[in-house]
Each structure stands twice: as structure tokens, then as C-alpha cells.
Design a protein with these regions (language model features):
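Active-site and donor-binding regions of nucleotide-sugar-utilizing enzymes
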Residues: 3-145
Length: 145
């Protein structure tokens, strides 16, 4: 299978790399393409964008880097479309990843799996509607999620 993964920060890179390792054991023909980091790259596949080039937290940093943020969104969408994976796997990072879920589901009809669900219990409860609409399978790492 062809897997496209998106992890936008260091902990996502760690969890996604472990997931990739497990997927390779179950699917020796696995092909990976991803936005991620060094740990994911060590598992193999094609690193499209390193998370260090896209991790902006808070309103002001996002605003100051809006051109880069929008470029990364466009790059990710076009790369997903070109690679056309069998599944899109999103790892946490909801501000970016929920946009990709909507795009993959509505424009490309690609199954969307979310590994490490967004913390809707902590903030932005409204995201639950988008998750229900655009995510096919959700995998939580905490028992109360």
C-alpha cells in the first residue's frame, strides 16, 4: 500500500516513525511519503517537508509566517494529489491536518485515518464536526479520548 503521513512536530515524528515501523512489518511492500522529521525519514520513504519548517504555534507566529503556512498547505495538497496514496494518516497537529483531511476526503476520496486524535476535550470542541465528516478511522493513545 501507499501511505501518506503528516506529523507537524517532534512528538508526532516519534509516534509516526513507530507506526511506520509497525506498518512495514505488516505490509512489506509499504511505500511512504510524508511531512515529518528525522525519525520518520530513518524508517524510509520520501520526506517532502521537515516539520521544523512548518511548526508555528500561536496567532502571532502564524500571522508573521502566513506566506510559508499557505505555501505548505498548497504543497501538501498537491503532493497528496500527485502521490495518490491508498490512505492518508494524520498524526495530531489538528490546525493543519484537519485541512488535509477535508481535502483528501472531499476532493480525492482517499480514506483518512487519524492517529493520536486532536485534543478536543482540551480546546476547540467544534472540531468534532469536521472529524466526524472527514475522518474514517480515529486511533487514540489516551484511554479517555
Amino acid at each position: 500500500m501507499k501511505y501518506y503521513l503528516i506529523a507537524g512536530e517532534a512528538s508526532g515524528d516519534l509516534h509516526a516513525s513507530k507506526l511506520m515501523n509497525a506498518l512495514k512489518k505488516e505490509d512489506p511492500q509499504a511505500q511512504f511519503r510524508f511531512f515529518g522529521g528525522d525519525l520518520m525519514q530513518a524508517e524510509g520513504g520520501a520526506l517532502v517537508k521537515h516539520y521544523s519548517e512548518m511548526a508555528y504555534m500561536g496567532f502571532i507566529p502564524v500571522l508573521l509566517n502566513i506566506d510559508k503556512v499557505l505555501h505548505n498547505i498548497r504543497l501538501c495538497k498537491s503532493d497528496i494529489e500527485e502521490f495518490h496514496p491508498d490512505v492518508l494518516i494524520l498524526v495530531d497537529y489538528p490546525g493543519f491536518n484537519l485541512r488535509m483531511a477535508k481535502f483528501a476526503k472531499t476532493r480525492l476520496n482517499i480514506p483518512v485515518h487519524y492517529y493520536i486524535s486532536p485534543k478536543i476535550w482540551a480546546w476547540k470542541e467544534y472540531r468534532i464536526k469536521d472529524i466526524k465528516r472527514y475522518v474514517d478511522k480515529m486511533y487514540s493513545i489516551l484511554p479517555f479520548e
